[in-house]
Amino acid sequence: SKISQSVNTIYKNENKIIGDNTDIFGFETSLKKSNQIIKNKKALILGAGGVVPSIIIALQKMQVLKIFLTNRTPEKALEIKKMFSEVETLSWGDIVDFDIIINATSIGLKPAESIDLDYKKISKNKFFYDVIYNPSETGFLKKARQFGAHTENGKMMFIYQALGAFKIWNGFQPKIDDELIKLL
């Protein structure tokens, strides 16, 4: 949580309150379970909110080749750049060649909202990830899927970060299977 400067789980240890971050584990595990190869790939992150440092750390752990970041408010992207100097910032709307694109903005929480991309230029071997899990298919994911891209929403990230928090609090991680996931 020090590197990400983000805490989403707190617990008590020897009368001290400790802050931890399970978003890194959640994002990394969800990518691994999606069977997408991330190593030596180029990632483009849309947004610069609180979860983005965790996403960057997870991508680095998975040995992505290059990380690009764009945000509607350029100052917020530059704050992330101060934390991760190797990240290349872009102006909002600029798109570079990428293998994985991650929507970490709030665009898509409302059904009528969509990210303005030229989806026709995006080949079928691209991977679109949206941290939003409700709705389960945002306009971003729907359009990408219509053009043949692989897509994943943030549901599994949410589940895995919750499992990480549960393990911190209880000392063990419960097993989950497809049946349980369908219920969530």
Range-by-range predicted roles:
Residues 1-34:
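Phosphate/diphosphate ligand-binding glycine-rich loop within oxidoreductases
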Residues 12, 127-180:
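Rossmann-fold NAD(P)-binding glycine/threonine-rich loop
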Residues 62-84:
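NAD(P)-binding Rossmann-fold cofactor-contacting core
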Residues 13, 36-42, 123-124:
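Short helix-loop-beta connector
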Residues 85-152:
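Rossmann-like adenosine-cofactor binding region
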Residues 61-66, 146-150:
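Conserved S-adenosyl-L-methionine
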Residues 21, 31, 40-60, 71:
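Glycine-rich adenosine-cofactor-binding loop
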